[in-house]
Swiss-Prot record:
The RxLR-dEER motif acts to carry the protein into the host cell cytoplasm through binding to cell surface phosphatidylinositol-3-phosphate. This is RxLR effector protein PexRD15. The gene is PexRD15. Transmembrane segments: none annotated. Residues 1-24 form the signal peptide. Coiled coil: none annotated. Induction: Expression is induced during host plant infection. It is found in: Secreted; Host cell membrane. It comes from Phytophthora infestans (strain T30-4). Belongs to the RxLR effector family. A motif (RxLR-dEER) lies at residues 48-66. Effector that enhances P.infestans colonization of Nicotiana benthamiana leaves. Keywords: Host cell membrane, Host membrane, Membrane, Secreted, Signal, Virulence.
Length: 242
């Protein structure tokens, strides 16, 4: 009986010894737990730092954008003041009742070129018709002749550049967005003059008498042919209207 109890106790002791964790293992497990916790803390800290850094960058970007906006606004105000001052200066050069031809010279529009090498240049014309000086001149035309300002402008331009060059100038002026509006109004005044004043009832008459081109060789001309075509449409519309 005693031997049996001794054997049972021995087996139990052996089982406990086998399944119980070793001291070194328990120590390693205890050390591992703080390591996991530390990693969580480190991750949270890093995340906070990243958020703070990102927030700082966003604030810096917003400050830069505000600075750019303020600078642009300031420059825009300065530009408007300078432009306004220049416009006022040019307007002050004109007399209230100054003739349009005289005003053309006063505003130094005659010094601005509209062509080179004997040909009207589209870029030069666009610059001329959209210039501040020309705009002030056209405003003056409205003041002194409210009934037909563009007719008066056409007459003054013809006296300076000649009728054919003015026709070419109007044609190429329609090609630019900056000068198209005034070019269309001058074109209307020009076609009206040709039809009702000069009595050119056909586009062929304009082609020969104004543009000084040979009708038999019409396809050899570029701009002249375009003016011919535009005036032909105007004549057709006018005949249908009246």
């Amino acid at each position: 009986m005693m031997k049996s109890l001794y054997a049972v106790n021995l087996v139990l002791l052996l089982l406990l010894a086998f399944f119980a964790p070793a001291p070194a293992t328990r120590e390693l497990n205890m050390r591992a737990a703080p390591s996991d916790s530390t990693r969580v803390v480190d991750y949270a800290t890093t995340e906070r730092l990243l958020r703070a850094h990102s927030s700082d960058k966003e604030e810096q970007k917003e400050e830069e954008e505000r600075a750019i906006s303020i600078n642009f606004s300031s420059l825009e105000k300065i530009f408007k003041k300078v432009t306004s001052a220049k416009t006022t200066e040019l307007q002050g050069m004109l007399k209230a009742d100054e003739a349009l031809g005289s005003a053309f010279k006063t505003l130094k529009l005659g010094t601005m070129r509209i062509g080179k090498d004997g040909s009207v240049d589209p870029k030069m014309v666009a610059k001329f018709l959209s210039s501040r000086n020309f705009k002030i001149w056209s405003q003056h035309a409205v003041k002194i002749n409210k009934d037909d300002p563009y007719g008066e402008m056409l007459k003054a331009l013809t006296n300076v550049f000649g009728e054919k060059n003015v026709a070419m100038m109007i044609l190429v002026g329609n090609l630019s967005r900056n000068s198209r509006d005034v070019a269309k109004k001058l074109e209307k005044a020009q076609f009206y003059k040709w039809y009702f004043v000069d009595k050119y009832k056909t586009a062929d008459e304009v082609f020969t008498n104004v543009l000084k081109a040979d009708r038999n060789r019409i396809h050899g001309y570029g701009r002249e042919k375009e003016i011919w075509g535009d005036y032909a449409k105007y004549v057709t519309t006018t005949v249908m209207k009246y």
